[in-house]
């Protein structure tokens, strides 16, 4: 099996806006599995943000990043939104915050309400031009936005091949810059590496949280399962009780507003 080259893209490639929306809308079920096996975020990532009175977690999913915000003493009030009600039902079990069904492009929030906005593992699903304008509308003049991604470290050859079998989204090249629009500019960034430990069965469950799996039919799912079982068991030699150490790349970006000139 020949593995394609590592992605050089700064954003995922969608055939159309319809394709992007269809892929994003796959996350309408399986939230419990998602929360159990998707990786957490290193707490140090929050050091990129100033303390804030009100912070909104956009595309919060099951609340992985929302929990981190709630555990920090630096944020007085935490709010969350996500397009998926299934995800939100799981979120409120782990992060008891005001949460509602909405998108980054249409938050349903009042103007200038938030001092900070976070968006973890979700910015690539949105219309970045519309979302940039909406986040400008709902935030204060000196607000910050934090964009965060956990990505399998495909610079490791066996992990790159694994990501292709899992269809995990090798879509963001090392050193990528996210697409943002005025008035936002990137003012700070952090890049780190860390590891997640899973059993082989949990690697299968992790695969089941990917957009590709969620929107595939049973025939495709059976093929992915067979390929992954072969790769983990026969090729890499992992037994059912062995720990698979998955290396991750963490990329975080702080956005601030361009200073507005007074008339």
Regions found by a protein language model. Give the residues of each.
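Conserved class I S-adenosyl-L-methionine
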Residues: 2-51, 53-61
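A generic alpha-to-beta junction signature in SAM-dependent methyltransferases
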Residues: 49, 126, 138-139
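Class I SAM-dependent methyltransferase SAM/SAH-binding core
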Residues: 62-106
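A short acidic, Gly/Pro-enriched loop at the edge of an enzyme's catalytic core
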Residues: 105-116
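A short SAM/SAH-binding and catalytic strip from SAM-dependent methyltransferases
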Residues: 115-129
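Conserved catalytic/acceptor-binding region of the Class I
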Residues: 130, 136, 140-198
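Conserved Class I S-adenosyl-L-methionine
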Residues: 183-263
């Amino acid at each position: 099996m020949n593995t394609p080259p590592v992605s050089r893209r700064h954003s995922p490639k969608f055939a159309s806006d319809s394709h992007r929306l269809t892929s994003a809308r796959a996350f309408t079920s399986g939230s419990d599995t998602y929360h159990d096996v998707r990786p957490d975020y290193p707490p140090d990532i929050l050091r990129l943000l100033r303390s804030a009175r009100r912070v909104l977690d956009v595309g919060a999913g099951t609340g992985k990043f929302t929990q981190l915000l709630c555990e920090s003493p630096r944020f007085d009030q935490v709010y969350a939104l996500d397009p998926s009600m299934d995800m939100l039902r799981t979120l409120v079990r782990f992060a008891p915050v005001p949460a509602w069904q909405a998108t980054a492009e249409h938050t349903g929030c009042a103007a200038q309400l938030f001092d900070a906005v976070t968006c973890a593992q979700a910015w690539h699903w949105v219309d970045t031009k519309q979302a940039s304008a909406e986040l400008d509308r709902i935030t204060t003049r000196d607000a910050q936005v934090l964009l965060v991604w956990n990505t399998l470290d495909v610079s490791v050859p066996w992990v790159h091949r694994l990501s292709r079998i899992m269809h995990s989204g090798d879509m963001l090249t090392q050193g990528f810059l996210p697409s943002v629009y005025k008035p936002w500019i990137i003012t700070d960034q952090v890049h780190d590496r860390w590891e997640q430990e899973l059993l082989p069965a949990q690697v299968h469950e992790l695969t089941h949280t990917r957009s590709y799996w969620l929107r595939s039919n049973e025939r495709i799912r059976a093929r992915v399962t067979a390929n992954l079982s072969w790769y983990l068991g026969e090729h890499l030699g992992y037994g059912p009780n062995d720990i698979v150490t998955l290396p991750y790349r963490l990329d975080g970006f702080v956005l601030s507003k361009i200073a507005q000139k007074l008339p």
